[in-house]
């Protein structure tokens, strides 16, 4: 499971011209589910993401978590994170999990994260427009297999 997390001042997502999820200060999370991902991958990400100290304290140091600042998260499914560009010029998505299983794991990730912070989402498998006011910018790529 691959998560791209971005520290944001604001983020929202539109589907068919309508805002379906919107947050203020917090994390924009793009989540890619890879073949073979399990509940264990979710556990690893959940033990890390809400506790990462990537928000500035009163001294300007990255010392606070999204929980500490009472922030929220916007979680967007993004199967292209499982893509490979090793061969040729067209990305391969062979490593992306099957849609049904990916949706199940995505929803479970959202449920688990919402135990710690308020969570909004996009629409799974929809064509979305994601608007991000990145703060910093501060962006991290977290692969559950590397944790």
UniProtKB/Swiss-Prot annotation:
Could you confirm whether the keyword Hydrolase appears in this record?
yes
Q: Which CDD domains match?
A: Dtyr_deacylase (cd00563)
Instruction: Give the EC class as a word.
Output: hydrolase
**What is the residue range of the motif Gly-cisPro motif, important for rejection of L-amino acids?**
136-137
Q: What is its main location?
A: cytoplasm
Question: Which GO CC terms are listed, alphabetically?
Answer: cytoplasm
Catalytic activity, reaction form:
glycyl-tRNA(Ala) + H2O = tRNA(Ala) + glycine + H(+); a D-aminoacyl-tRNA + H2O = a tRNA + a D-alpha-amino acid + H(+)
Cite the entry's keywords alphabetically: Cytoplasm, Hydrolase, RNA-binding, tRNA-binding
Protein EC: 3.1.1.96
Tell me any Pfam family this protein matches: Tyr_Deacylase
- GO terms, biological process: D-amino acid catabolic process
An example Gene Ontology molecular-function term: D-tyrosyl-tRNA(Tyr) deacylase activity
Where does the protein end up? Cytoplasm
Quaternary structure per UniProt?
Answer: Homodimer.
Q: Which family does it belong to?
A: Belongs to the DTD family.
- Function of the protein: An aminoacyl-tRNA editing enzyme that deacylates mischarged D-aminoacyl-tRNAs. Also deacylates mischarged glycyl-tRNA(Ala), protecting cells against glycine mischarging by AlaRS. Acts via tRNA-based rather than protein-based catalysis; rejects L-amino acids rather than detecting D-amino acids in the active site. By recycling D-aminoacyl-tRNA to D-amino acids and free tRNA molecules, this enzyme counteracts the toxicity associated with the formation of D-aminoacyl-tRNA entities in vivo and helps enforce protein L-homochirality.
Note the PANTHER family from the entry: D-AMINOACYL-TRNA DEACYLASE 1, D-TYROSYL-TRNA TYR DEACYLASE
Regarding domains, what does the record say?
Answer: A Gly-cisPro motif from one monomer fits into the active site of the other monomer to allow specific chiral rejection of L-amino acids.
Write the protein's name.
D-aminoacyl-tRNA deacylase
Q: What is the lineage of its organism?
A: Bacteria, Pseudomonadati, Aquificota, Aquificia, Aquificales
């Amino acid at each position: 499971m691959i998560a791209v997390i971005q520290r944001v001042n604001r983020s929202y997502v539109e589907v068919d011209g309508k805002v379906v999820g919107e947050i203020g200060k917090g994390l924009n999370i793009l989540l890619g589910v890879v073949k073979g991902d399990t509940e264990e991958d979710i556990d690893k990400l959940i033990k890390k993401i809400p506790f990462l100290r990537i928000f500035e304290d009163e001294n300007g140091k990255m010392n606070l978590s999204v929980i500490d600042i009472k922030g929220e998260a916007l979680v967007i499914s993004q199967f292209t994170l499982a893509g490979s560009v090793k061969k040729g010029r067209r990305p391969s998505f062979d490593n992306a999990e099957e849609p049904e299983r990916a949706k199940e794991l995505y929803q479970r990730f959202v449920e688990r994260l919402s135990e710690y912070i308020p969570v909004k989402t996009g629409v799974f498998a929809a064509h979305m427009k994601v608007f991000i006011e990145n703060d910093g910018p501060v962006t991290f790529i977290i692969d559950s297999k590397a944790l």
